Amino acid sequence: MKKVVLLILDGFGINTKTPEENAIVQANTPTFDKIFPLLQTQLDASGRSVWLPDGQMWNSEVWHMTIGTWRINKQSLVEIEDMLDDGSFAKLEWYKWAIEHCQKNDSSLHLLQLFWPGWVHAMDSHLEKILKLIPSDIKVFLHLFWDGRDLAPNSLLPLMQSFEKKLHEFPNVQIASLAGRYFAMDRDNNRERIQKAYDEIIFSQFQTSDTPSEYIAKSYEKWIMDEFIEPISFVGYDQICSWDSIIFLNFRSDRARQMTQALMVSMHPELKFEYPKRSRHFITKQITNMY
């Protein structure tokens, strides 16, 4: 019986197209120089080969899962992207229920999401495609959270400026509130942080007449960067009303869990959040339980 060794070298890749950019190629590696000619194949650990967007490496979780299961695992962001592109997203039972519920009760739809061009917790392109699916007779309120950790800490102002222009195509859509992820996506039971973002989503406690871009720019002037932007709501938004539907669009659950529990507080009395005594229909879906 032949013995097999699985040797994992972190950061050790094969790049022959631009060897001047590959430290391994430039280094003196006599042992690997002997081993490489004996290799029978190469593995691609990025892009669609591991069910990620083309050209993306993402993070080590993908590789851990692929190595551990020895198969390609569908990654949430790509599966959602494919479903939005082929039309199957609009056929999901929970999505159809949320839309029909709003139409039946003449109520609003609230979408919550980390808004950024990355792919760890959510993707802004998903939000834009979902907005195109929603019937124009439904009022849509967006509750957007800023990153500031996986991107530069002040990178989202131009993204918001661009998004505000795109929203002219959707007269039924309004940005209702903003919050840095420090508040809205805490996962360490700092409930006072979640409370501040929750109060804006539920009660619209502190309103500003600024546009979202203006509010972000003023925050930057105070050296308050994306992650720590204070929760705020905007003129034109009141609060979550009876029979509204809520969909949390983050596909990674760890930093969506506490806000979800807060919004579902009537089902979790141990959580010390105030909440309006009214019916709220809340939907939070990860790709793993969309079916």
Please place each PLM-identified region on the residue numbering:
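Short, hydrophobic/glycine-enriched beta-strand segments
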Residues: 3-10, 246-250
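Short, exposed beta-strand "edge-strand" segments with a Pro/Gly-rich flavor and a Y/T-containing core
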Residues: 24-26, 86-90, 203-210, 246
